[in-house]
Amino acid sequence: MNKEYIMVIDEGTTSLRAVIFNKKMELLFQSQKPIEMICPADGEVEQSPLEIYEKTVEAMKDVLETGGLKAEQIAAIGITNQRGTWALWSKKTGMPYTNFITWMDTRSERSKPYFSTHEKFNELFPDQMDMMPPWNFVLSFQQMCEERPELLEIVKDSDTLYGTIDTWIIYKLTGGRSFTISSSSDHTGPFYVLGNMDEKYKSAELFGMHQDILPQVLDEADDYGRLDPDILGEEIPIFGNIADQQSSLFSQGCINTGDAKCTCGTGAFVNVNIGDKFLTNHSVTSYIAWTLDGQSVNCIEGVAGNAGTCLEWAKGQIGLIEDFSSMEDIAQSVSDNDGVYFVPALAGMECANYLVPSAKGSFQGLTVRTKKEHLLRSIMEAIAFAIANVFDQLEIIGFDIEKIYIDGGVSKSNMICQKLSNVTGLTVIRSKNTESTALGAAEMAAIKLGWMKEEDVLNYVESDREFIPDENRQRDKEEFEHWKQYVEVICNIYRQ
């Protein structure tokens, strides 16, 4: 039987999917499963490793059934995953010691007073605490140890393994035979601060972790092992593994220095290909984008907050919309925001130069005239403004960007794309394939299979629509300035 398909496992934040691509990199079938968010306390956002693995296997079986395919028709598996999310588990039993601590978790803030006077910490990470993201392992793990002191002994035990979601899934899918991580997931993981390769070993040293607790780092198009035949009845090779934002950067064809994309999903992330350069400051961070044949390409990244999370909240928690299909019409049923602005700090404020994990979201400018349409419009505008703010910071540090490739579920909004174009003054090109993270993982597996080369990725880039600045540009730029003022006010309140 011909092996003509690639299966991609896309481990997202709120759901996971199994997706089937053909040799033309066309998405044919998919199966999606929701993932429960576990919030034990304020600022804590976890997920169950066992639920994620079990639902991954369910999705893999479902997508084959949906497509009427057999496992022996799958040439390879590719994986892409949310980043900065980690767990500990036992090598002997394969059972987790902890839940996954997600990239949205902010418990790390509670550890900062402890480490501010910690001699060993300040020796290993001099003047770096303020640059540590909320998902930093050292800060989060210390807080966990306050409640579970036994974890300090667990990480010293040679039976204990650490991994991000890709490491866990590959470990389980291969029956424990492959303990690996991609260079992109490794470098955007919780062990790094400034991106220096020795930082993860410093973090391990701080807690006396045993030397084999960290997974082997591989290229993105590499051999990650074989699927346990007990799962689908076939030993399918796992040939691609790439972190989600880097995956969409690749599949959008951003393979040349200076190419920029924004992915708007649960969160909004801006990435720019910077070749072999490396730059990190308080607004943006450099990461490995991908490694092929041992050669790494780097990207600079700016986080633009919780895009999809805000819209899910608007729908599910406060009932501004009944379904997302009506969102655009409702927001545009009013001519402007009537002076209402939304500060999108529903899980802290993380937006380039605005990094205040303890901040809380708010509406500003409410009056007796304010309607729910204004509230919804202000939320959608805040998503565009947050992304524009990242490009502001990139311009300040010297990046000359001409156009923005945009993808992800939130990019389906014409209003958000147009607002982004107006505020930045740049052409915004929306991808026809809004599932670019899965596509990038399929392309990495295809490269390992010999079906394509890196430069062939440009053959699979399709645009849906281009947005250029229109007659509302001046108004939108003024509203952007007002929004930044409100964000600054809220951040200052919670910095105190």
State what each model feature region is.
Residues 56-75, 148-155, 201-211, 390-402:
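Phosphate/pyrophosphate-binding loops at sites that engage ATP/ADP/AMP, CoA/4′-phosphopantetheine
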Residues 185-295, 305-309, 314, 322-325, ...:
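ATP-dependent carbohydrate kinase catalytic cores
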Residues 1-32, 39, 75-116, 150, ...:
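Glycine/Thr-rich phosphate-binding loops that ligate phosphate moieties of nucleotide
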Residues 11-13, 124-245, 311, 315-316, ...:
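Gly/Ser/Thr-rich active-site cleft segment
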Residues 45, 121-132, 296, 470:
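Short glycine/proline- and acidic residue-enriched helix-loop micro-motifs
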